[in-house]
Swiss-Prot record:
S-adenosyl-L-methionine binds at residues 63, 65, 83, 99, 124. GO terms for cellular component: cytoplasm. It catalyses: uridine(2552) in 23S rRNA + S-adenosyl-L-methionine = 2'-O-methyluridine(2552) in 23S rRNA + S-adenosyl-L-homocysteine + H(+). Specifically methylates the uridine in position 2552 of 23S rRNA at the 2'-O position of the ribose in the fully assembled 50S ribosomal subunit. This is Ribosomal RNA large subunit methyltransferase E. Keywords: Cytoplasm, Methyltransferase, rRNA processing, S-adenosyl-L-methionine, Transferase. Its EC number is 2.1.1.166. Disulfide bonds: none annotated.
Length: 209
C-alpha cells in the first residue's frame, strides 16, 4: 500500500513538474533549472548583482543560480560555488564539490575565497524532504543557519545575502537574526516559486559593519 501511494505521489510530481511553464521555458532556453527564473525575479526587484562582483553560491547544483549570476556580473566578476552533487562547468564559476559542513571542504571553500571581498552570499540549499514538516523544517533551518554563518565569515560590509527558507518553526527567529545583521531585509515569494511550496526567499542587503 505504501509503495502504491509513493508511486502515485511520484507520478503526480512528475506530471506537475513537466507541465510547469517555468520548467518548459528553462528547457527551451537551455537553462540548468527553473531556479534561474526565481533569481531573475529577485534581481529585477532588489538589484542584488552588479558587474565585477565576487559571489559565493551554496547548494549550487545543477547551476541555475550561478548560470544567471554570471550574466549579471560579467567577465570581471567571480563566483565560488559549492554543492554535494556534481555540476557541469560554467565559465566564470569556480565549483567545489563537497559538503561544506565538512571541515576540509569548508577550508577548501574559504581558501578559494581567499582575500576577495565577497559582495553576495546566496543559498538555494534544501535537505532531502520526506514530506513530514516536523522532520523537514528543522533540517532545512539547520542548512540556512549554516548559510548565514558563511555570510558572517566572508561577506564584506554593505554586502547582500539571499537565502531560500521554508516557512515553519524557527522562521521568525531566523528572520529577526538576519534583520539584526543587515540594514534592509525583504521576504520574497517569486511567481516562479510553486504556490503550494513553503519556500520563500529572504533578500538581505547592506550588511552592517
Amino acid at each position: 500500500m505504501t509503495g502504491k501511494k509513493r508511486s502515485a505521489s511520484s507520478s503526480r510530481w512528475l506530471q506537475e513538474h513537466f507541465s510547469d511553464k517555468y520548467v518548459q521555458q528553462a528547457q527551451k532556453k537551455g537553462l540548468r533549472s527553473r531556479a534561474w527564473f526565481k533569481l531573475d525575479e529577485i534581481q529585477q526587484s532588489d538589484k542584488i548583482f552588479k558587474p565585477g562582483m565576487t559571489i559565493v553560491d551554496l547548494g549550487a547544483a545543477p547551476g541555475g543560480w550561478s548560470q544567471y549570476a554570471v550574466t549579471q556580473i560579467g567577465n570581471s566578476g567571480r563566483i565560488i560555488a559549492c554543492d554535494l552533487l556534481p555540476m557541469d562547468p560554467i565559465v566564470g564559476v569556480d565549483f567545489l564539490q563537497g559538503d561544506f559542513r565538512d571541515e576540509l571542504v569548508l577550508k577548501a571553500l574559504l581558501e578559494r575565497v581567499g582575500d576577495s571581498k565577497v559582495q553576495v552570499v546566496m543559498s538555494d540549499m534544501a535537505p532531502n524532504m520526506c514530506g513530514t514538516p516536523a522532520v523537514d523544517i528543522p533540517r532545512a533551518m539547520y542548512l540556512v543557519e549554516l548559510a548565514l554563518e558563511m555570510s558572517r565569515d566572508v561577506l564584506a560590509p554593505g554586502g547582500s545575502f539571499v537565502v531560500k527558507v521554508f516557512q515553519g518553526e524557527g522562521f521568525d527567529e531566523y528572520l529577526r537574526e538576519i534583520r539584526s545583521l543587515f540594514t534592509k531585509v525583504k521576504v520574497r515569494k517569486p511567481d516562479s516559486s510553486r504556490a503550494r511550496s513553503r519556500e520563500v526567499y529572504i533578500v538581505a542587503t547592506g550588511r552592517k559593519p
